[in-house]
């Protein structure tokens, strides 16, 4: 029961809460104030902060401002107090004319929350305008026959104020004939009429002067006057009459100027002059008389100025018809202006930003704007849009407000700015549209690392380059901007041949240009691997790297090195033997040389620069083989001197020379015998012949004795040096190790065949002594057709030296051994012409050099398996003549051992053309000359 009694109270409380919520919502939705016109600037209007329920400080922090449209700013906000004050002079008549009440609407924007509040301010009228007549003096003509009670409409006055301050009454100065009657129209205006109270007598008084006063109801009262001059005429007792008291017409606002819109007609019952009617527009304040024109004779109403629905929706025109004597009547024309779609929508940008970060989240607000169309109805209905391919969208708010927001993440590297075109379109037919442009810059963040144009780089630099020379330039591009795109360059520190990489090259951190800090030597360093780093200046910085390969190109900076003949260090000259029975093409010796360079710079050619007997010898262009060019004659000198030049093919070419001494004889005793037979023939009747012979023999004996002593000393020195070489493994002293594989082996191999010549006291006998080689077996001469024995020596000594030598020799390099299929044939079977073919490229050249030197090394240690014939090193006919060594052991067949019938043989003990056991089976026919 108690619950039932409390139910009505709960229902009342609920209704009260609902009413309060409704009032609060209405209050929150719109704020209304009232202020008088013409108050001072800065006058208080209302407390916005209080009415919004905010503190003034909070209101200032949220960024509050007034958003108005289409007219000057009349109000302002005081951010400290939160008060709304007047900003300019307010004239109600200018703003609202005769409209009452006069309401001004504007919006208040809280920028922090982008919240809009509507504010309505009523402008109350003050009595600041006095009534005014359209004409200051009015002339009336009245016939003397006019009966009392006749009414004459007068010009009415206009007061711009409204309410009590508007026109309230008319008054006429006291007189005997006229009175004033004021009638109220349907529109609320007051129209004065002059009433004839007593008949007129023109002869008594022809003109009457009256004063009409119009007063308002303000405090103080304001008034205006108009003077009326009444002339008394003869009888004209009928005034013109319009066909209808009020005319109504509707025309579109785009009606052209000069168009006739209406023709009014008034008739007068009088005749003659009294019936002649003319038409006039009543002069009144405003623009009506400036827009329309009424032709006085025809009554045609035409347009003389463009109409604008947005300025005035209708026009009320007062027209007059007056006859000849001056009687007139009035009518009204109401012109309604029809709206046409002649106004495009307008943009009012409320808030907009000019820049947005590229990492802004979708939904970021870019700007707030309003769209308004001055037309009405469907012509004022607006829609707003933007292109579909942009990462933005429009969100509509209240009162045609729109928010521009992002729809997805932005990327400055794709689009650094957006020229956003907003299009507002109305609902007219045809529709009108307006475009607004917003230039939005996308602020950069460091989201891109520098990128190189290639994944790796390679460059070539010639050796012996100057220090500080520019080697290469790398460039990385960063699509970011400003500091995020500023790229600096460096490289990863590394160690090259025990030295830091920074001691070889440097890099300009700004330009990416690499410089050489030292002069490179191809023979020591052939390439460098560098990791270049490109780093931007963002926060945090981003970087990328790229591989750079620097290849050192070979230059011709090393002259050829002559390996054979290697002359003794005491300055003596070796002697080569050429038998007089040698046929053209006989191999005398071979010049062996190498070049520390590579490629074309290491291609060698041999030339005969000088010869004591031109045309007797020739040198192979590519092989260096010295051969007889023709058969030896008896007139050819015993001693022939040859100068051979070895030249590479670099630019410019480098060369080296060697001087060879060739003794033309079958054996050394033959040389001595020939030298001994060179005695001057006896002349008859020469008395001093005996004396000359004695002196000559003595001189020759002394010279020969000195020569024998020198050769003996030389022999002892070479024997001692040979022992030293055997103790040191047969390596050459005083020569730098070559970078070519097997050069040291070639030197050891050639050292094996160094020989000495010594002469005994018997000038017709000689000894050719070979130092013990580093190994027991020697290469078998391909040109030799006889197999000779070693020099007589204790067998135990030879075996001991073999064991010592083999213990010092390195095992053969199996990498350079060729299979049977890879042995195209011996080069020893090729003729040593000068038309050899050069290798096609640097790879072939280096491979050839490596094979030559490795083959020479294997020949030195007695384990060569190149095959293809003795001394040919298994090379093909194409490359065989370049470095053949088969001629080296051939010289032993020309050696005669004094006091013995033995001759030199190969290591296997072969003599007299007999092949040893286990030989290669290649036998020469006896009795034939040695030929290649």
UniProtKB/Swiss-Prot annotation:
It is found in: Cell membrane. InterPro entries: Cadherin-like_dom, Cadherin-like_sf, Cadherin_C, Cadherin_CBD, Cadherin_CS, Cadherin_N, Protocadherin/Cadherin-CA. Its main location: membrane. The chain crosses the membrane at residues 693-713. Residues 1-28 form the signal peptide. Keywords: Calcium, Cell adhesion, Cell membrane, Glycoprotein, Membrane, Repeat, Signal, Transmembrane, Transmembrane helix. One of its GO terms (cellular component) is plasma membrane. It holds the Pfam family Cadherin_2. Residues 798-841, 902-932 are annotated as: Disordered. Residues 922-932 have a biased composition (Basic residues). GO terms for molecular function: calcium ion binding. Residues 29-133, 134-242, 243-347, 348-452, 453-562, 570-682 form the Cadherin domain. Residues 29-692 are extracellular. One of its GO terms (biological process) is cell adhesion. Residues 806-841 have a biased composition (Polar residues). Residues 714-932 are cytoplasmic. The keyword Cytoplasm does not apply. Glycans are attached at residues 419, 545, 685. It is a single-pass type I membrane protein. Potential calcium-dependent cell-adhesion protein. May be involved in the establishment and maintenance of specific neuronal connections in the brain. This is Protocadherin gamma-A2. It comes from Pan troglodytes (Chimpanzee). The lineage of its organism: Eukaryota, Metazoa, Chordata, Craniata, Vertebrata.
């Amino acid at each position: 029961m108690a619950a039932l009694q409390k139910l009505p109270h709960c229902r009342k409380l609920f209704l009260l809460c609902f009413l309060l919520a409704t009032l609060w919502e209405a209050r929150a939705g719109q704020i209304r104030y009232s202020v008088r016109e013409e108050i001072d600037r800065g006058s208080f209007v209302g407390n916005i902060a209080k009415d919004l329920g905010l503190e003034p400080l909070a209101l200032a922090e949220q960024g509050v401002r007034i958003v108005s449209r289409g007219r000057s700013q009349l109000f302002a906000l005081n951010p400290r107090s939160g008060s709304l004050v007047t900003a300019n002079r307010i004239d109600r008549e200018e703003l609202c004319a005769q409209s009452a009440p006069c309401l001004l609407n504007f919006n208040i924007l809280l920028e922090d929350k982008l919240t809009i509040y509507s504010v309505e301010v009523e402008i109350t009228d003050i009595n600041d305008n006095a009534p005014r007549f359209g004409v200051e003096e009015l002339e009336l003509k009245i016939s003397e026959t006019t009966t009392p009670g006749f009414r004459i409409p007068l010009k009415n006055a206009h007061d711009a104020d409204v309410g009590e301050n508007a026109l309230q009454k008319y008054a006429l100065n006291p007189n005997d004939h006229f009175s004033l009657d004021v009638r109220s129209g349907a529109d609320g205006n007051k129209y004065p009429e002059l009433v004839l109270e007593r008949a007129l007598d023109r002869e008594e008084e022809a003109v009457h002067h009256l004063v009409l006063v119009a007063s308002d109801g303000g405090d103080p009262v304001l008034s205006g006057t108009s003077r009326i001059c009444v002339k008394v005429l003869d009888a004209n007792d009928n005034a013109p009459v319009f066909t209808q008291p009020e005319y109504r017409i509707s025309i579109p606002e785009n009606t052209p100027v000069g168009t006739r819109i209406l023709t009014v007609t008034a008739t007068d019952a009088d005749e003659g002059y009294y019936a002649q009617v003319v038409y006039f527009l009543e002069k009144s304040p405003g623009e009506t008389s400036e827009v329309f024109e009424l032709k006085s004779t025809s009554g045609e109403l035409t347009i003389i100025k463009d109409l604008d629905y947005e300025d005035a929706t209708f026009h009320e025109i007062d027209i007059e018809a007056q006859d000849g004597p001056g009687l007139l009547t009035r009518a009204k024309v109401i012109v309604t202006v029809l709206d046409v779609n002649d106004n495009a929508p307008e943009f009012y940008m409320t808030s907009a930003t000019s820049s947005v970060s590229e990492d802004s989240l979708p939904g970021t607000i870019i700007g707030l704007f309003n769209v308004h169309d001055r037309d009405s109805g469907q012509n004022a209905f607006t829609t707003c849009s933007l292109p579909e391919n942009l990462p933005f969208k429009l969100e509509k708010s209240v009162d045609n407000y729109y928010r521009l927001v992002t729809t997805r993440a932005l990327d400055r590297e794709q689009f650094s700015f957006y020229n956003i075109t907003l299009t507002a379109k109305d609902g007219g037919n045809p529709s009108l549209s307006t475009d607004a442009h917003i230039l939005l810059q996308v602020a950069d963040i460091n989201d891109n690392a520098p990128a190189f144009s290639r994944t790796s780089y390679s460059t070539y630099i010639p050796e012996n380059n100057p220090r500080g020379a520019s080697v290469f330039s790398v460039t990385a591009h960063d699509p970011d901007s400003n500091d995020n795109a500023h790229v600096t360059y460096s490289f990863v520190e590394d160690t090259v041949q025990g030295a830091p990489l920074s001691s070889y090259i440097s890099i300009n951190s700004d330009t990416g240009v690499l410089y050489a800090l030292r002069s490179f030597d191809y023979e020591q360093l052939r390439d460098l691997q560098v990791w270049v780093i490109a780093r931007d200046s963002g926060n945090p910085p981003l970087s990328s790297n790229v591989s750079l390969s620097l290849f050192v190109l070979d230059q011709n900076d090393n002259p050829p090195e002559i390996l054979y003949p290697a002359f003794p260090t005491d300055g003596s000259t070796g002697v080569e033997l050429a038998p007089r029975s040698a046929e053209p093409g006989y191999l005398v010796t071979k010049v062996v040389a190498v070049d520390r360079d590579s490629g074309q710079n290491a291609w060698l050619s041999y030339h005969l620069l000088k010869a004591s007997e031109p045309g007797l010898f020739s040198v192979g262009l590519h092989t260096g083989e010295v051969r007889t060019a023709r058969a030896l004659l008896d007139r050819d000198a015993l001693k022939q001197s040859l100068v051979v030049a070895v030249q590479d093919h670099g630019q410019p070419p480098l060369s080296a020379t060697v001087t060879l001494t060739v003794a033309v004889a079958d054996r050394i005793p033959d040389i001595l015998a020939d030298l001994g037979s060179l005695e001057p023939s006896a002349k008859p009747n020469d008395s001093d012949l005996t004396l000359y012979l004695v002196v000559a023999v003595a001189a020759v004996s002394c010279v020969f004795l000195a020569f024998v002593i020198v050769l003996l000393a030389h022999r002892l020195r070479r024997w001692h040096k040979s022992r030293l070489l055997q103790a040191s493994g047969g390596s050459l002293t005083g020569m730098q190790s070559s970078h070519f594989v097997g050069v040291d082996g070639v030197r050891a191999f050639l050292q094996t065949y160094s020989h000495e010549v010594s002469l005994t006291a018997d000038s017709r006998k000689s000894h050719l002594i070979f130092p013990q080689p580093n190994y027991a077996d020697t290469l078998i001469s391909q040109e030799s057709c006889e197999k000779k024995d070693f020099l007589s020596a204790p067998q135990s000594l030879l075996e001991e030296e073999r064991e010592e030598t083999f213990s010092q020799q390195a095992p053969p390099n199996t990498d350079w051994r060729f299979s049977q299929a890879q042995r195209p044939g011996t080069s020893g079977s090729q003729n040593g012409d000068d038309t050899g073919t050069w290798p096609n490229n640097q790879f072939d050249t280096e491979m050839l050099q490596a094979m030559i030197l490795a083959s020479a090394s294997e020949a030195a240690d007695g384990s060569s398996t190149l095959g293809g014939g003795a001394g040919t090193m298994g090379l093909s006919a194409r490359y065989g003549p370049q470095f053949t060594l088969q001629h080296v052991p051939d010289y032993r067949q020309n050696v005669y051992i004094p006091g013995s019938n033995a001759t030199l043989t190969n290591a296997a003990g072969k003599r007299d053309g007999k092949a040893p056991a286990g030989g290669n089976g290649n036998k020469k026919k006896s009795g034939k000359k040695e030929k290649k």
